[in-house]
Amino acid sequence: MMDVQTVRRGNAVQSLMSKLILPLVMAVAFALPARAALQIDITQGNVDPLPIAITDFVGEGSVGADMSAVISNNLERSGLFRPLPKASFIEKVSDINVQPRFGDWRVINSQALVTGQTRMEADGRLRVEFRLWDVLGEQQLTGLQFFTTPDNWRRVAHLISDAIYKRLTGEDGYFDTRIVYVSETGPKNARVKRLTIMDQDGHNPRMLTRGNELVLTPRFSPNSQEITYLAYRNNQPRVYVLDIETGQQEVVGEFPGMTFAPRFSPDGQRIIMSLQRGGNSDIYTMDLRSRQVVRLTNTAAIDTAPSYSPDGRQITFESDRGGSQQIYVMDASGSNQRRISFGQGSYATPVWSPRGDLIAFTKITGGRFVIGVMRPDGTGERVLTDGFHNEGPTWAPNGRVLMFFRETRGAQGGPSLWSVDVTGYNERPSPTPTFASDPAWSPRIQ
């Protein structure tokens, strides 16, 4: 975790450890005619990326250029921005408190401009400031100032990326987040699997388990500080909760028979999962305080892969009770169970969007695995991407982007992580140092 301070000009505001930044509006010291604010409409499907100039932040050493590179990479990968090459820049920014020469930026067709500076304070902290400018409107849109330790510069770059995304799209960014996944090493028939966590852009990977047991389906807690996952030791399934920072973990459930897909409830008080008892696989919840287990489904079918709606009132899951794998929705009490998928093929791994408006899924049809979305009532089904083997969608916290894993064919093939936005137009590989499967996207870091 990092201690970040955010400062309003003339009024310091120190955040507590593990708090996100507070908004900051920098004073604009010059009058401009009122114009419509620069905005990207991300609700209209495929959009032309906004040309944006992101200058190297002014300051000593390489940290300013490094931060600029992280911000450029974040925004470019979103598919909504087109960072312009620095070689095309006419104005060389040396003081961010001086109004830019907007004409120089219009010449290179930039519509937005990011400037910034870094400075080491006498107490050893790193101070970072940035400004976001509307080039055509010739006005400052936002600005923030941070104080942090020098080794946390990368997270500050993610926070700045989120601020830019928010100001220009009107929606929350997702760059100050992490991904937990199962890293896979070794030959295909004897893979060693370890839980690994990394920043959403692939940097700072860190192993969380040693690889001495099979690990599956890691999922974040709502505060992003814990992970629940399934591990097999001596062929016995156990459900764990792992503290990411301390590495401490506890067994919260050890169940006879098969266990699948543990996941936190939105309030973090329960874990929902599929347990096999009496030959049936049904959906159960466990209260993490009392350890009381409650059964929600009771059929002769296989019910698995449960996921709560963001308000905790409903649950989606997969079941073959109708003869093939399909997606169902029920109330959180287990009542009102109904099927919502009716397209061709089989459906699996449903997961509710953080916005509540969509359910993502894996669909197997015609020998191909597709990632798609539908509304919670089953209408509006859309395929986002397909291929030989795509599986395991997980949502970014703003509900605009999904990550999943894709298998490649052959003896040397293996799984890798990919992302795609809800339009299906912006699909990207997500870098990992090893083969990688079963990703889970964190909420915003607290």
Curated annotation (Swiss-Prot):
Keywords: Cell cycle, Cell division, Periplasm, Signal. One of its GO terms (biological process) is cell division. It comes from the Bacteria. Residues 1-36 form the signal peptide. It holds the Pfam family PD40. Residues 424-446 are annotated as: Disordered. The Tol-Pal system is composed of five core proteins: the inner membrane proteins TolA, TolQ and TolR, the periplasmic protein TolB and the outer membrane protein Pal. They form a network linking the inner and outer membranes and the peptidoglycan layer. Part of the Tol-Pal system, which plays a role in outer membrane invagination during cell division and is important for maintaining outer membrane integrity. NCBIfam families: propeller_TolB. This is Tol-Pal system protein TolB. The gene is tolB.
